[in-house]
Amino acid sequence: MGVPTMDQQWLNTYREEIGGFSNTIHSFAQGEIARKDYKGISGGFGSYAQRDAAKHMLRLRLPGGRVTPERLHFMAQAVQQYHVPFLKLTTCEAIQMHDLTPDEVPAIMEAAIPCGIITRGGGGDNPRNIQASPLTGVQPGEAFDVMPWAEAATEYLLSICRDIHMPRKLKVAFCNGVDDCVHTAFRDMGFVAQPDGTFKLYIAGGLGGGWRMGILAAESLPAEDVLYYIRGMITTFCQHGNYQNRAKARTRFMQETLGPDELRRVFLENVAAAKADESLKLHLTPAAITKTGTGTLDDPRAIAQKQPGLYAVAYHPIGGRLIPEKLVQLDNLLSTIPGCECRVAPNETLYIINLTADEAAAVLDATADGAKTLFETSVACIGASICQQGVRDSQSVLQRAVQAVREANIPDGALPKVCISGCTSSCSGHQAAAIGFQGTVKAVPGGKPAPAFAIFLGGSDALGHAHLGDTIGTVYEEQLPALLVELGQAAAAAGQNWQTWSAADPDAVNSIIAKYV
């Protein structure tokens, strides 16, 4: 008996569910279902109504952020057929289509199935898109390619998603052992590849309200046993998660109710019980990349792969907003390049991998409209102009900040990548950023509260050294670009990059921020 997968029966049921959801979305459009009730249904299908309830978002689940040529071609066709205005690369390595009509959402869900895109469980109290280091399989220095485990875990979780009822969502990430951009240190489950072929596992971490660093649950977890540990977490979460208070329903709150040591004990006990089901044992071998290349390339966006002669190209559309024309352009170009594929990264960067030097040069030309500095790779959630939950329009703020920094001629490196969230949910990961912003309001003397952002300083997601930043005040939204410009000017005047300057002279950093809070 093999590992449970999304077999034909599962897919047939999924198609039937899409038909039922089509009726639901149209009932909502006709005012027959309240917004809150609709959200509880639509999230399970990876779709939400936007702030303008006539428009909808659909989240395309991409295990490990992997965009195969078939998936890229499907999306390129879909944006043309349905006139999709824009797409959003997400911090969970998915791609969202926005401003869709009630007719378009179920139609795209159905059309996505043949290329392996399943939107089921893309929202709501479900296992979310499983993340993997975006350059896994090609990154120099990695322990091993973790993509097969991310994909196997996705198959398993989707196969059982109808049979489990968790208190809230579950986020799982796999790190290849080079960097921790997927935030394994503070996920519900974070697997870190080790040089001996095992995984280190952290559990019950998370950003947002009541944030917690994950607790170490296993030092050398056999790779073949990954699904037993996932099953053990689901059992533990269902046993001890909070079904009464959604604000305290994520796995991280089990650290409070049970305590870290007891949580670890209960979890490992449930893992041991799960091992009675021998069908969950994995036997995976990463696919070998046989493509070779010649020539060299020197460009800050071109990354040499561990395969000699091959490169990955980084493309970061500002704010992670991808225009449909660019998607179509990339599909047309990459369809002529054998062996390449795309990867969505948690910082909203799109990597195009397995390129020769000449192919990489062509991709660099096609993506020249993206971020040109570290600061321009800053992360912002979709923001309050679209998101129902949002408090501030993080996308607008980022666009204004990028423009201000460009006009001030701040040199590359003087400012770090910043992360901007429109609310407390930390969708941008602002709590783990060198500089993070969280949407809020701030009192105005003698007036009404004004749009503002809480400032987080000093966070890091560095592998083995991850920690969360400190809140140091609140800046009015209209002054946020000026604050960043002044910080960048100070670092540049010192002749240092942000990391060096902020570490060497924290008093100077704080004195500048103090003028704005």
Q: How would you name each of these model-derived features?
A:
Residues 46-52, 83-89, 239-244, 301-307, ...:
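Short, flexible, solvent-exposed loop/turn segments with mixed acidic/basic and small polar residues
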Residues 304-311, 318-344, 484-486, 490-493, ...:
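Long hydrophobic segments that form regular secondary structure
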Residues 2-4, 29-33, 55-198, 228, ...:
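Small-residue-enriched alpha-helical segments and adjacent helix-cap loops
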Residues 2-4, 8, 166-265, 433-496:
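Mobile "lid/hinge" segments at catalytic clefts and subdomain interfaces of large enzymes
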Residues 85-89, 160-167, 238-255, 262, ...:
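Flexible, glycine/charged-enriched surface loops at secondary-structure junctions
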Residues 99, 103-107, 111-116, 238-302, ...:
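Terminal amphipathic helices with adjacent charged low-complexity linkers/tails
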Residues 41-47, 73-84, 203, 235-238, ...:
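Short amphipathic beta-strand starts and helix->beta connectors
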Residues 1-71, 179-180, 191, 294-310:
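N-terminal basic/disordered segments at the start of proteins
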